[in-house]
């Protein structure tokens, strides 16, 4: 099951998350984590060109860190010709340096991929995601989960 949403339809965060795009991260650098999450999306059949998407993520990070604070990063890349958005989630047990705006290490990485021609839909997705992650209890729950199924329960109904 893939976690995609057609950018012409409404979405919920729970509709964008699926078990095949959630992982417990083992990498200890931002670049390696971006690669790991890109690979996850490619294996789920969401990327025709994983390498190009990965390079786009690195280019975006070089402009400005996507570490939004609160232990969260939301890297994102645009995919030419894509009709769908997807969200991949990586959870890191210890946290890594990400040059986040609050200086804290990052433990939750939400990778967004989607069409380059749907900026308003992307902003709605980003807004919904950041609003959801402002909930300290939800972030705390995500940091305590042990299984992908537990992650899915945290986002049920969101």
Predicted regions and their residues:
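Cytosolic covalent-transfer regions centered on His/Cys nucleophiles
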Residues: 1-158
């Amino acid at each position: 099951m893939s976690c995609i949403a057609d950018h012409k339809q409404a979405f919920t965060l729970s509709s964008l998350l699926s078990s095949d795009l959630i992982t417990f991260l083992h990498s200890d650098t931002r670049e390696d984590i971006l690669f790991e999450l890109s690979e996850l999306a490619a294996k789920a059949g969401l990327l025709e060109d994983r390498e190009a998407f990965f390079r786009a993520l690195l280019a975006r990070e070089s402009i400005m860190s996507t570490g939004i604070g609160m232990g969260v990063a939301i890297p994102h890349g645009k995919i030419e010709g894509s009709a769908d958005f997807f969200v991949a989630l990586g959870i890191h047990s210890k946290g890594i340096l990400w040059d986040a705006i609050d200086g804290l290490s990052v433990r939750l990485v939400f990778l967004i991929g989607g069409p380059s021609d749907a900026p308003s839909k992307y902003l709605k997705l980003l807004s919904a995601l950041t609003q959801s992650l402002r909930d300290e209890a939800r972030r705390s729950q995500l940091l305590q989960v042990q299984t992908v199924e537990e992650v899915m329960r945290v986002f049920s109904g969101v």
